[in-house]
């Protein structure tokens, strides 16, 4: 459980740090995140065992939506702080937010959720990341940029869940039918 949670929590940020050539990795420099992950895993295991509680996939989408927003905002801000061009900062925000979950699903032998259900996920991160970039261009305070970006990505994801939004699915051979 700790390994899978660690991949989900740190995978996207680690890839971002590799791509930005940032050392040490954020979770090495700030080991408190490792301790927090371990503590949360212990609490989750105790809670699940004591209560015989099995959270549904739908229930787990809410904290995931919040994480998507927070990781998008911070990942984009880190790339901006590294003086990356706007489009690179946006992509780094998306990588930070999405790649950990992709790693988690692959390790669990599942098709990554970000790719399988056609609900907006990465595109929510894309929109939130642009909020950070635009706020920076407008000289908005950093805290406001992060809050607005996290709120945008989270809200879009929550709306996608609640309203069952889907993106068009590519169908092999669809062009041949035309």
Where are these regions (language model features)?
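Alpha-helical transmembrane segments and their membrane-interface boundaries
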Residues: 1-87, 109, 113-178
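Membrane-helix boundary/interface segments in integral membrane proteins
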Residues: 99-111
